[in-house]
UniProtKB/Swiss-Prot annotation:
This is Phosphoglucosamine mutase. SUPFAM superfamilies: Phosphoglucomutase, C-terminal domain, Phosphoglucomutase, first 3 domains. The keyword Isomerase applies. Catalyzes the conversion of glucosamine-6-phosphate to glucosamine-1-phosphate. The active site is at S103 (phosphoserine intermediate). InterPro entries: A-D-PHexomutase_a/b/a-I, A-D-PHexomutase_a/b/a-I/II/III, A-D-PHexomutase_a/b/a-II, A-D-PHexomutase_a/b/a-III, A-D-PHexomutase_C, A-D-PHexomutase_C_sf, A-D-PHexomutase_CS, Alpha-D-phosphohexomutase_SF. One of its GO terms (cellular component) is cytosol.
């Protein structure tokens, strides 16, 4: 079931070009209609939110017009994080939620992401139904002119409700911690003051003045350099950085070192296990997590399960097998006991709570994980679908793995989106890892490279 409009994260594109207001209207209209067919209510209720990028209001208004045209009751949340929408859909018992964001991508992009009433991404089946309507030659959906049209109301209490929910996910306040908070000039900007003040944190906000054009710009979880500097200059205990829509969190320890998603999962997983809260003693990760994290988990008798790259696959695995902690190196971390998607502010509170409760510094807690040097090589290939069947490629991979003898790993896989073969290796030293990647790369070039 290949979808034309919906990618792994909803409908994405360059705002006002690929993702035009006209398309947003149609996505609202088609999505709204599909919901009316599956809802028990006479008038389905949908929550709509956006991040801080300048195109958000244009797309929000177009999308809402589409929803109203097929009779949906819309509650407009304004600027709220993606996980905020996922939580509020469930708390409000709405039929769906829609988030307008392109997450960590550059400002010219935007996207439309639907959540079902359960707070998870819409099912593939429902997305397929919406696609069928978007692709139809003519729009035959109902067009009421009076009774049967939808209504819209601002729902500012939503943000307060979400903040109170976050606060009750940790058992005590966080007094005594000094923390720098980087809001990426994104959707968390309006939340951090209330949240961290309520938790009695001595906090220093940075990059919390969105102007519509500065979301993620040299700041936030994808550019933590300004956070590293601020933590050291302010002699803070640690720093946390979110991304544009608030579904990621990366930390910086008291010495100014980056503590990525792998290390955060390890620290929180070990703590949850000690408290008897980690289901099946297991952390769910993607294949891109660092070998150092797996070794640290093993040293504490904790298990891990690997999925394909993408937080949706992590969530699928967690739901299927009853795990409650998982995530990605990039900082999408899912605490399934609390929320249905990666949640940056929730992750930050859990991490701060562990730091306070342990009495250790973040640097000490992260020290258990020795990050192995990692190198990634992309090679353009003629046919990525058959690349992995090449005998010589299989042989060199097996040879390298034998030489590593458990102190390193190789991951060779076709790109999900481009005609590339991705060769990733981790080993004890940068020199070794470079040698391994190049040896596999040489064979791939000779056997598979585009002429």
């Amino acid at each position: 079931m290949k979808l034309k409009y919906f990618g792994t994260d909803g409908v994405r594109g360059v705002a006002n070009q690929d993702l035009s207001p006209e398309l947003a209207f149609r996505v609202g209209r088609a999505g709204g209609y599909v919901l009316t067919r599956h809802s028990e209510r006479k008038q389905p209720q949908v929550l709509v939110a956006r991040d801080t990028r300048i195109s958000g209001e244009m797309l929000e208004n177009a999308l809402i017009a589409g929803l109203l045209s097929v009779g949906i009751e819309v509650l407009r949340l304004g600027v709220v994080t993606t996980p905020g929408v996922a939580y509020l859909v469930r708390a409000q018992e709405a039929d769906a939620g829609v988030m307008i964001t392109a997450s960590h991508n550059p400002i010219k992009y935007n996207g439309i992401k639907y959540f079902g009433g359960n707070g998870f991404k819409l099912s593939d089946e429902l997305e397929y139904e919406i696609e069928q309507l978007l692709d139809a030659e003519e729009d035959t959906l109902p067009r009421p002119s009076d009774a049967g049209l939808g209504t819209v109301a601002d729902y500012h209490e939503g943000a307060l409700k979400y903040t109170s929910f976050l606060e009750q996910t940790v058992s005590s306040d966080l007094e005594g911690l000094k923390v720098v908070v980087d809001a990426a000039n994104g959707a968390t900007s309006g939340f951090i003051s209330n949240l961290f003040a309520d938790m009695n944190v001595d906090f220093i906000p940075i990059n919390d003045q969105p102007d519509g054009l500065n979301t993620n710009l040299n700041c936030g979880s994808t550019h933590p350099e300004s956070l590293q500097k601020a933590v050291v200059e302010n002699n803070a205990d640690l720093g946390v950085a979110f991304d544009g829509d608030g579904d990621r969190c990366i930390a910086v320890d008291n010495e100014g070192n980056i503590v990525d998603g792998d290390k955060i999962m390890y620290i929180c997983g070990k703590y949850m296990d000690k408290k008897g809260l980690l289901k099946k003693d297991t952390v769910v990760t993607t294949v891109m997590s660092n070998l150092g994290m797996y070794k640290a988990l093993e040293a504490h008798n904790l298990k891990s399960v690997k999925t394909k790259v993408g937080d949706r696959y992590v969530v699928e695995e967690m739901l299927k097998n009853g795990y409650n902690l998982g995530g990605e190196q990039s900082g999408h971390i899912i605490f399934l006991d609390h929320n249905t998607t990666g949640d940056g502010m929730l992750t930050a509170l859990q991490l701060l709570s562990v730091v306070k409760d342990s009495g250790k510094t973040l640097a000490e807690l992260a020290n258990d994980v020795t990050t192995y040097p990692q190198e990634l090589l992309n090679i353009k290939v003629a046919d990525k679908t058959t690349a992995m069947e090449n005998q010589k490629l299989k042989e060199i991979i097996a040879q390298v793995e034998k030489e590593m003898n458990g102190d390193g790993r190789v991951l060779v896989r076709p790109s999900g989106t481009e005609p590339l073969l991705r060769i990733m290796a981790e080993a004890a030293t940068p020199e070794l890892v470079h040698e391994y990647v190049e040896r596999i790369g040489d064979v791939a070039r000779a056997e598979l490279e585009v002429e």
